[in-house]
Design a protein with these regions (language model features):
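Conserved phosphate-donor/acceptor-positioning beta-strand/loop module used by diverse small-molecule
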Residues: 89-90, 101-132
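ATP-binding Walker
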Residues: 12
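Extreme N-terminal starter segment of soluble prokaryotic enzymes
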Residues: 1-4
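P-loop (Walker A) phosphate-binding loop of NTP-binding proteins
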Residues: 9
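Small-molecule kinase domains that catalyze NTP-dependent phosphoryl transfer to phosphate-bearing small molecules
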Residues: 126-181, 185, 192
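Walker A/P-loop
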Residues: 15
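ATP-dependent small-molecule kinase phosphotransfer cores
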Residues: 28-87, 91-98, 127, 135-139
């Protein structure tokens, strides 16, 4: 199984990587964030970052640090014959990066300048949480980058970045150029 985990800062283009690989290269795309959003809806909770973090922490405590990867792989295995591989977006805990590697997969880190990312998030208005100040955006990002050192189930994106095999910068707004750069990088790793 070809397995790609995608991590990165908010608004950098993690879902874009998944969508490109699904549309242009036949991968199944699963957003871990969408799994968590669905669980919020199931529990009648507002879809807010604090609830997403709480549920992901709960699942990690119950099922291990790689549980979100395992949930996505389980979904993939139900229809794998229809796909070239699995791409998962929004890895935010180092146990998820470790699990991707244990399964023979590759981790990609996607990043962009904080102002570029803030403007993307603010303009898309995916949820009411996207309507925040730049300072709030940076504060939340800091919390997610470094997590709680006393809680291995917390978000710790800085360590996920360190464990990534490929770093992609997505500074522009030209999705075709980004898709071409992504494809070239993945070909060099024999993933396309």
């Amino acid at each position: 199984m070809k397995l790609i985990g995608v991590a990165g800062t908010n608004g950098a283009g993690k879902d874009s990587v998944g969508e490109i690989l699904a549309k242009e290269h036949g991968y199944m795309f699963i957003s871990v964030t969408n799994l968590l959003r669905a669980e919020c809806t199931k529990r009648s909770l507002p879809i807010e970052r604090e609830h997403l973090r709480a549920i992901s922490g709960e699942w990690r405590r119950e099922g291990g640090l790689g549980v979100l990867v395992d949930k996505a792989v389980e979904l993939y295995r139900q229809s794998y014959e229809n796909y070239q591989g699995l791409v998962m977006a929004s890895m935010r805990n180092d146990g998820e990066a470790d699990r991707i590697h244990e399964l023979g997969g590759t981790m990609i880190w996607v990043d962009a300048d904080s102002k570029v990312r803030y403007n993307r998030i603010y303009s898309r208005q995916r949820t009411t949480e996207d309507n925040k100040t730049y300072e709030q955006f940076l504060s939340e990002e800091k919390d997610e980058m470094f997590g709680n050192p006393n809680d291995p189930t917390s978000l710790n994106m800085a360590v996920v970045k360190e464990k990534s095999d490929l770093i992609m910068l997505n500074e522009g707004n030209d999705i075709a150029t980004f898709a071409n750069d992504l494809a070239a990088s993945l070909r060099s790793l024999n993933l396309l």
